[in-house]
Amino acid sequence: MANMKNSNDRIILFRKAGEKVDATKMLFLTEYGLSHEADTDTEDTMDGSYNTGGSVESTMSGTAKMFYGDDFADEIEDAVVDRVLYEAWEVESRIPGKNGDATKFKAKYFQGFHNKFELKAEANGIDEYEYEYGVNGRFQRGFATLPEAVTKKLKATGYRFHDTTKADALTGEDLTAIPQPKVDSSTVTPGEV
């Protein structure tokens, strides 16, 4: 059986162009998409019609939940209004590089602008936002390093996809890092449920 890709292993990072800082991971992303659309023109001739080429438009899009202190959501909203150039990475965290890229992961690299920020809120719900990011030119394939802050956040969740093989069994630190519900026995009165 094929080893299917798990969407949770795809990590989306952004960085404002020109800043010498680690890229920021989008948190609480619930949906992600990447589309490429070719705008081709057809020209009719006496020998039939043919495509004259055209341009390709690439767009990243997604939906993320918001949380108190979510500065990144504000940053994306400002980037749409202020037309700020951003770098972006789509990293496949389960596909490590080889040889000189052994500490990195398969990735796509983009440069472009955030074109849409839409806040969505409903009664008794969790706020979320949708974004669209328009890619300048063609994306590049390569391998990317996950910033230390990102790897710490991923490890702190204690939960990631594990394969069925013994080589990827849940053991050691991964096992003890999984958050578990706990009851503080000092606050429970006997007979109480």
Swiss-Prot record:
Keyword field: Viral tail protein, Virion
GO CC, any one term: virus tail
Record's keyword annotation contains Signal: no
Major location (coarse): virion
Signal sequence annotation: none
Compartments it resides in: Virion
Name used for this protein in its record: Putative tail protein
Annotated source species: Staphylococcus phage phiMR25
Record lineage: Viruses, Duplodnaviria, Heunggongvirae, Uroviricota, Caudoviricetes
